[in-house]
Amino acid sequence: MLRLFQAASRASLRLSGSRVIHSLAEGAERPAEISEPRDSAGLLDPVLRKCELRIPVHRRPVQAWVESLRGFEQERIGLAELHPDVFATAPRLDIVHQVAIWQRNFRRISYANTKTRAEVSGGGRKPWQQKGSGRARHGSIRSPLWRGGGVAHGPRGPTSYYYMLPMKVRALGLKVALTVKLMQDDLHIVDSLELPTADPQYLTELAQYRHWGSSVLLVDLTHEEMPKNVVAATSGLNSFNLIPAVGLNVYSMLKHQTLVLTLPSVAFLEDKLLWQDSRYTPLYPFRLPYSDFP
């Protein structure tokens, strides 16, 4: 029995050893068959824009794809480095809500207007004598107590709902909106807004091919630098809007599903928004909030 047990143990050790050696041999062969994926961002795709502004030591620039509008297949032509303090901020949705409500109230005017007892026609005489009739005393039939009389404490339009929101809150709202758009893959960066044709159908088919949604907001640096083809193409489309970078706002970004920025507009937005973080408390009257812009 002892000899049988020793022989069986030797056979099992030989089998297990051969299995281990065979598995190790297979594991050594697998890396030769399966090649590791290369970092396409570092080897193949060029960096078309580098963030030249100062970045905190504990943060790194955010990388995003740069696309082209000159063709359907030119979806990714390179990379762009974005400043993390503008395109990677904390998602303060309460700030976005404050800025959006402020923008809507900024242009809101109520024209509701009611007449007081002095403006309603009639009621010049006392309806009945003060005493003796048994009825309640009244001095005019146009009193607010009467039907058809004037309104007490009614709206006296036009009424403006304008109020001033702090400049840094507005800048933070823009940063949060840009960050949310980028994280939701609704922010696309292009090298320019050059189109091969001025046909609106080309722009519509391009947006459908790239799944940009039902509404697109195109942003360029200035009106003068906007290409003629994109101006002609967007003029006949209700779902495409074209604005300069200085007019970009939170309400427009929330209203449109996709935001398209050019490389010069990205540099402009980073410069202006980061300047708000380091600006000194203004010594001038607040009625001139833009007088110290760089």
Curated annotation (Swiss-Prot):
It is found in: Mitochondrion. Belongs to the universal ribosomal protein uL4 family. The keyword Ribonucleoprotein applies. Component of the mitochondrial ribosome large subunit (39S) which comprises a 16S rRNA and about 50 distinct proteins. Interacts with MIEF1 upstream open reading frame protein. This is Large ribosomal subunit protein uL4m. GO terms for molecular function: structural constituent of ribosome. GO terms for biological process: mitochondrial translation. It comes from Mus musculus (Mouse). The keyword Transmembrane helix does not apply. One of its GO terms (cellular component) is mitochondrial large ribosomal subunit. It comes from the Eukaryota. Pfam families: Ribosomal_L4 (PF00573). HAMAP family: Ribosomal_uL4_B. The modification Omega-N-methylarginine is found at R147. NCBIfam families: rplD_bact. Keywords: Methylation, Mitochondrion, Ribonucleoprotein, Ribosomal protein. Residues 119-139 are annotated as: Disordered. Its main location: mitochondrion.
